[in-house]
Regions:
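A beta-strand/beta-hairpin structural motif
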Residues: 9-27, 106-126
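Short, small-residue-biased leader/transition segments that mark boundaries at the very start
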Residues: 2-7
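Solvent-exposed residues in well-ordered beta-strands and their adjoining turns
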Residues: 19, 41, 81, 101-103, ...
Length: 173
């Protein structure tokens, strides 16, 4: 499909955390093609000025890959924990920012910024905090310029670019 072709062309830099045991089992070389299966994690890094949400992939399995193209696929289910924010890009495209809380073991949750596009953006903008959703997308990285009192600084944002999303339940269900 055209949407999956876009995913094949986009280059994203993703931070991966790997246990030493997994690395010891497989010698890595720079620019090696890898298959990483794992969980997306988030935490607030409070060091330095301003809070910064850090998004990583915690590798459960890692292996060398002989696939002819890279595949960046994420499947999530969780709960909207902030009101959706519908906006228009400078190119005139509708996008909606969502914050998804994804529960994991031991009462912890990961908070993952997600973006829907076009007609889906307009639809998801109407959803309420507490709505349960399931989605498919990719973990994307994008550069942006942050203007500070001391000048402009280039930063990288990590977010889930949503390909498909469905509402599992509304807050009052």
């Amino acid at each position: 499909s055209a949407a999956s072709d876009v995913y094949k062309r986009q280059i994203d830099r993703v931070n991966v955390v790997v246990r030493e045991r997994l690395l010891a089992e497989m010698p890595l070389e720079e620019s090696a093609r890898l298959c990483v299966i794992g969980d997306v994690r988030s935490f607030n890094n409070r060091r330095g000025p301003g809070a910064k949400l850090v998004i990583t992939v915690f590798a459960r399995d890692i292996s060398l890959s002989d696939e002819p193209y890279d595949r960046n696929l994420i499947l999530l289910s969780g709960t909207l924990c902030k009101p959706p924010n519908l906006r228009t890009t400078p190119m005139g495209r509708d996008i909606c920012d969502l914050m998804l809380a994804v529960n994991r073991h031991y009462g912890r949750s990961d908070y993952l910024p997600c973006i829907t596009w076009g007609a889906r953006a307009c639809e998801t903008a109407l959803w309420d905090v507490g709505t349960r959703v399931s989605l498919e997308g990719r973990l994307q990285s994008r550069s942006y310029i942050k203007v500070l009192d001391t000048g402009a600084v280039e930063r990288t944002a990590f977010e889930v670019s949503v390909l498909d999303i469905c509402r599992l339940s509304a807050p009052d269900d």
